[in-house]
Amino acid sequence: MTDLDGPLVYVVDDDAALRDSLRWLLESAGHRVAACAGAEAFLATYAAEQGGCLLLDIRMPGMSGLELQDELKRRGHAIPIIFITGHGDVPMAVNAVKKGAFEFVEKPFNAQALLVLIDNALAIDAETRRRAARFERLTSREREVMELIVAGKRNQDIAAELSITIKTVEAHRSGVMRKLGVDSIAALVKLVQNMGAPRRK
């Protein structure tokens, strides 16, 4: 499936009744849904280029939700994750959010609140993908200059490190800021820092 098909909400839970219930709720709200019985099945079907979010049970047989979160991070995938948790798993879910998960919901959850969370997660995923597309437009030299600017280097230091003139550094810096749509070094630094894992608003 391509981005032209719209974002996809993945539901990963070993409880078939809950999976079916979530699929019905999400499809009723107009979302496209892919439901999987476990983490392994999700990994076999997940397409990183497809926009979306992941509704994930924290405790499952085989690979747990937390282990799947770690595996996705290891593979460099930044899909927003909303963990589904029982009351006793709240400390575990809080830890998952600290490690980059978007949010967690406790069972039994409010359907309307869950739909709002999913809409927020999809909006953040779309924005992250837009930012990533802007970064893709940078040349390799512009990326080098950008990384050194973000590291706090001055133009003359960047010029010396890359064996180019200060004027060339300034031209690359101007190109970076134009392509990324920022108008200050502070905004550039913030944009680069925000390119990590999606977090809740």
Region locations from a protein language model:
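Basic, Lys/Arg-enriched C-terminal extension of HTH/homeodomain DNA-binding domains
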Residues: 177-201
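Acidic catalytic/metal-coordinating carboxylates
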Residues: 37-38, 64-70
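Conserved acidic segment of CheY-like receiver
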Residues: 3-17, 22-26, 39, 54, ...
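Active-site residues of response regulator receiver
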Residues: 57, 85
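Active-site beta3 strand of CheY-like receiver
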Residues: 49-55
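C-terminal output helix
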Residues: 89-91, 105-118, 161
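Receiver (REC) domain active-site loop signature in two-component systems and cognate sites
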Residues: 60
